[in-house]
């Protein structure tokens, strides 16, 4: 008899009044209120309704932030594809988009608002989600008492002719203070899962090694029976409430079992050995061979690329026909039966048939460094890469990403850098001299690593996962004002020397903080 996994607690969200929101939310809900009606924490307008000038971030405030790190983070988890609904049918997105509020900043913000006179309800974050189409009603998310919520009834109809769309999450506090509008990554609209033998010509429907997928099981095609592979409390289980995003890694066929393993590039094909690793916990399942499912059989000889929303089975390698299977909320091993008439097939039950789909994540992090602000914190800039340009005494850093605006400045640690906005995807700044971080230093004596951060002109801090490292030089660099001249010129040109060395051959590195996932393999009970 299979032994069970810990059962995840079920929560029944309280019924909430339906609210229709189709237009954009106002930027400042406290405008037009009297002094008595205005929330105590809300910045008041100046004379004749003029807003007070924004507070620029101070160096002391940045130091406090770097020490405390009280960030507020909005995570939007969703599938990369969505199946279109035809006529009156509603094919709800599966897995359902999920919004998480992460970071200690949410609790601190709530406590601060309540200290300033807000009630518990007024300090509660509220959220609505939609598909970015004003014709369709946005749905309210229930975030009361927890840090996540799923949108289980979103769909896109055939009257919507878009081939791609983005989810839109509108957030505000219970007292109507605006937080902003957060967008998901791009989602591709498909008509239905491809039943033809897939080819790599449709690469956007194939699944690459090292990307994230969700797996769900639906008994007898009943929506209410849908369960998702998920990790909770150090155990794999089949959850009806939450879904997990798992890295799917392609392995060599002769790769042995272990916590460390070598992965391959390329697209996942049926018949190949894969490893599923939870993107949150690092928990991993044993080595698996992914097999195509046809009705209630696993095909042993299929070798075509795995495609979005395909049904597949996972054979536990080096076992006697054991497959990854669910039994209610438990994850177990199920022993398949050979097909007497077809040697290339094995009979499995419904619980061993999993639907696979690629997933994505949009992540937005912010912190009100100088206290509450009037404007929404969105759009939240996202830095994707750094490129060091120039050499010698002119060290300039180019930032590439999304949602850049002219009112942003680049900070290196607690030092603000001279910044030039180029476009929504590119910014340029002068790298501060090492003396700004180490008083008395004229050149770099030992490696110094500082975080790279973006700051809005009203004190909102947007952290990145990027750092900048000063590495030792043999002597001082001569001072030159050329960098300032480059910034003052309204030109998108950058110095032609784009290597990562200066004229003396010394390295100054822009780097991403990457964390390697160490997986711990879980045992699947039989």
From Swiss-Prot:
Transcriptional regulator that plays a central role in Notch signaling, a signaling pathway involved in cell-cell communication that regulates a broad spectrum of cell-fate determinations. Acts as a transcriptional repressor when it is not associated with Notch proteins. When associated with some NICD product of Notch proteins (Notch intracellular domain), it acts as a transcriptional activator that activates transcription of Notch target genes. The keyword Transcription applies. GO terms for cellular component: cytoplasm; MAML1-RBP-Jkappa- ICN1 complex; nucleolus; nucleoplasm; nucleus; transcription regulator complex; transcription repressor complex. InterPro entries: Beta-trefoil_DNA-bd_dom (IPR015350), BTD_sf (IPR036358), CLS_fam (IPR040159), Ig-like_fold (IPR013783), Ig_E-set (IPR014756), p53-like_TF_DNA-bd_sf (IPR008967), RBP-J/Cbf11/Cbf12_DNA-bd (IPR015351), RBP-J/Cbf11_DNA-bd_sf (IPR037095). Changing residue 186 to E: No effect on interaction with L3MBTL3. It comes from Mus musculus (Mouse). Residues 508-526 have a biased composition (Low complexity). This is Recombining binding protein suppressor of hairless.
């Amino acid at each position: 008899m299979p032994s069970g996994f810990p059962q995840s607690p079920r929560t029944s969200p309280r019924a909430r009044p339906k609210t229709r929101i189709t237009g954009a939310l106002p930027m400042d809900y406290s405008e037009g209120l009297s002094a008595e009606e205005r929330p105590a924490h809300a910045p008041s307008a100046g004379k004749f309704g003029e807003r007070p000038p924004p507070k620029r971030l101070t160096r002391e405030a940045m130091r406090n932030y770097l020490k405390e790190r009280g960030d507020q983070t909005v995570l939007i988890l969703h599938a990369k594809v969505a199946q279109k609904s035809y006529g009156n049918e509603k094919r709800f997105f599966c897995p359902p988009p999920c919004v998480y509020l992460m970071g200690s900043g949410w609790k601190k913000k709530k406590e601060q608002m309540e200290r300033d006179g807000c009630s518990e309800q007024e300090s509660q974050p509220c959220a609505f989600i939609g598909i970015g189409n004003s014709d369709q009603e946005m749905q309210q998310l229930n975030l009361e008492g927890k840090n996540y919520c799923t949108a289980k009834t979103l769909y896109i109809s055939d009257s919507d002719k878009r081939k791609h769309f983005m989810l839109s999450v509108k957030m505000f506090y219970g007292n109507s203070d605006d937080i902003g509008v957060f967008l998901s990554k791009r989602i591709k609209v498909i008509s239905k899962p491809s039943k033809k033998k897939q080819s790599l010509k449709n690469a956007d429907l194939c699944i690459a090694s090292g990307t994230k997928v969700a797996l769900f099981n639906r008994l007898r095609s009943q929506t209410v029976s849908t369960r998702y592979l998920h990790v909770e409390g150090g155990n794999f289980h089949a959850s009806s409430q939450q879904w997990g995003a798992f890295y799917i890694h392609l392995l060599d066929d002769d790769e042995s079992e272990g916590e460390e393993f070598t992965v391959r590039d390329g697209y996942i094909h049926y018949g190949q050995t894969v490893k599923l690793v939870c993107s949150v916990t690092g928990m991993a399942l044993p080595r698996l061979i992914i097999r195509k499912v046809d009705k209630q059989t696993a095909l042993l000889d299929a070798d075509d690329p795995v495609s979005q929303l395909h049904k597949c089975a996972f054979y536990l390698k080096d076992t006697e026909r054991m497959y990854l299977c669910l039994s209610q909320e438990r994850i177990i091993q199920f022993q398949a039966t050979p097909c007497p008439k077809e040697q290339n097939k094995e009979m499995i039950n419904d619980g061993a048939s999993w639907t696979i789909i690629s997933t994505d994540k949009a992540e937005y992090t912010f912190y009100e460094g100088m206290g509450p602000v009037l404007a929404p914190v969105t759009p939240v800039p996202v830095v994707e890469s750094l490129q060091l340009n120039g050499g010698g005494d002119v060290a300039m850093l180019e930032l590439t990403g999304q949602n850049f605006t002219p009112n942003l400045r680049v900070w290196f640690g607690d030092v603000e850098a001279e910044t030039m906005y180029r476009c929504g995807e590119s910014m340029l700044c002068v790298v501060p001299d090492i003396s700004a971080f180490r008083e008395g230093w004229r050149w770099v004596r030992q490696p110094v690593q500082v975080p790279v951060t973006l700051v809005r002109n009203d004190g909102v801090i947007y952290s990145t996962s990027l750092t900048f490292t000063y590495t030792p030089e043999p002597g001082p660099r001569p001072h030159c004002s050329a960098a300032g001249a480059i910034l003052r010129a309204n030109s998108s040109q950058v110095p032609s020397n784009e290597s990562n060395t200066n004229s003396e051959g010394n390295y100054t590195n822009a780097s991403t903080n990457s964390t390697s996932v160490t997986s711990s393999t879980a045992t699947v009970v039989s």
